[in-house]
């Protein structure tokens, strides 16, 4: 099987320290043909991937699935690169389930970034969007025009811990906290041996080297959640607010989760924020986060403990936007605070009958049998309380 992947890493003009060194590394990477970031995977690629190995790799019992596999055969979606690895598994599982039921289906997902996904959804160019931030305000109002007679619903399909990944020779363990992270990403701390970092890492040999921050150059829900975390937990050290575009003022840009992970993997002295699954794939070192009570390493268990406290903004069936502010500020022992919920954004009404049936069928599969083995991909499967609410909302799509 051959998979064609378009790869690109975008670096903006120098916006902070270490720019020339970083760009020199990028030039060397381009000359050597290194892979720098996944931009898109075509629908035929996903279909081929599923038909080659879904039945053997997913181990799904189709008879136990509530997915009907009805409606149109091909769905299109775009958005969050953070959920790409999870979406690959959801699609593979769904194809496998429907194959066992005698149906041929496919979902083409382009990990173009959360902001782009929301834009394409509003324009009616895709059937649903993937986003690490809920659609809201003006965009939600515009979505009502697309969802004729309905509105856009944010449906959480998976939780993804955000890793603070770094490349620092000789430093296998690093502890940071929200205040120090805020100062690193706003330019207040520029050296790895800064006293504030040293105070959190007693006995560690920290080099007298510049810190190169790597940020998302595209509109990203991961960026939004990372900045919300800094805003909530840094005791006022972060004053740049939040949003899908990075507002901190310093950093070298790379496109997508794959882009920032690849950039840090090849740039000594660098640091970024990226989903755990991409940090794992690139074998990056990941910092522990000191929450005020203790330093907490990022594991599936520590992320799950934090996510267990997630709350919805509404008790109604339908939109399931989560309030993660309490998680960001947690000091519960053994709870990792830096997590995001990644959503599928759908129309509550307004689809034609074939699209509605297909969207509901795919989401039903993703919300249930699709959750199996997600931990192996660096995600946290849905807690039962979220899963129950999600299934009710999927059923309510008309």
Question: Across the structure, where does each feature detected by a protein language model lie?
Answer:
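Periplasmic-binding protein-like
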Residues: 149-166, 288-343
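Extracellular/periplasmic catalytic domains that process cell-envelope and extracellular macromolecules
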Residues: 69, 121-123, 147-149, 155-159, ...
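Extracellular/periplasmic juxtamembrane helices and adjacent flexible linkers that interface
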Residues: 29, 51-55, 67-70, 201-209, ...
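N-terminal segment of the mature folded domain
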Residues: 59-198, 257, 261-263, 274-282
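Ligand-binding pocket segment of bilobal, Venus flytrap-like solute-binding proteins
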Residues: 118, 219-313
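Extracytoplasmic ligand-binding site segments that recognize negatively charged/polar headgroups
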Residues: 161-165, 171-262
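Bacterial lipoprotein signal-peptidase II cleavage site
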Residues: 46-60
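Sec-dependent bacterial lipoprotein signal peptides
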Residues: 1-47
């Amino acid at each position: 099987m051959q998979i064609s992947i378009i790869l690109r890493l975008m670096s903006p003009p120098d916006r902070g320290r270490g720019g020339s060194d970083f760009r020199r590394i990028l030039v060397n990477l381009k000359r050597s043909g290194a892979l720098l970031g996944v931009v898109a995977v075509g629908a035929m690629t996903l279909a081929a991937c599923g038909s080659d190995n879904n039945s053997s790799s997913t181990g799904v019992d189709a008879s136990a699935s509530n997915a009907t596999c009805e409606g149109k055969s091909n769905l299109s979606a775009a958005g969050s690169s953070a959920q790409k690895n999870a979406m690959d598994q959801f699609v593979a599982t769904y194809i496998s389930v429907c194959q066992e039921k005698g149906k041929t289906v496919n979902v083409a997902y382009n990990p173009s970034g959360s902001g782009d996904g929301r834009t394409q959804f509003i324009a009616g160019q895709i059937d649903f969007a993937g986003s690490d931030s809920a659609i809201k305000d003006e965009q939600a109002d515009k979505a009502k025009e697309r969802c004729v007679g309905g509105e856009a619903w944010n449906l959480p399909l998976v939780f993804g811990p955000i890793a603070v990944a770094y490349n620092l020779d000789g430093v296998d363990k690093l502890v940071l906290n929200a205040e120090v992270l805020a100062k690193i990403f706003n330019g207040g701390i520029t050296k790895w041996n800064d006293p504030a970092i040293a105070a959190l890492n007693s006995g560690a040999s920290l080099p007298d080297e510049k810190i190169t921050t790597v940020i998302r150059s595209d509109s990203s829900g991961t960026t939004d959640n990372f900045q919300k975390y800094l805003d909530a937990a840094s005791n006022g050290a972060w004053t740049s607010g939040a949003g899908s575009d990075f507002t901190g003022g310093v950093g070298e840009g790379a496109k997508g989760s794959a882009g920032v992970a690849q950039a840090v993997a090849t740039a000594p002295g660098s640091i970024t924020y990226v989903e755990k699954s991409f940090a794992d794939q690139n074998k990056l070192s990941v910092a522990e986060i000191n929450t005020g009570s203790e330093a907490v390493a990022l594991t599936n268990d520590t992320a799950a403990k934090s996510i267990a406290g997630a709350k919805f903004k509404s008790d109604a069936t339908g939109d399931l936007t989560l309030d993660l502010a309490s998680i960001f500020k947690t000091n519960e022992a053994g709870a990792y605070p830096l997590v995001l919920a990644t959503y599928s954004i759908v129309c509550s009404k307004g689809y034609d009958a074939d699209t509605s049936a297909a969207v509901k069928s795919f989401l039903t599969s993703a919300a249930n049998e699709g959750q199996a083995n997600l931990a192996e991909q660096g995600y946290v499967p849905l807690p039962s309380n979220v899963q129950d609410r999600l299934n009710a909302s999927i059923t309510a799509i008309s």
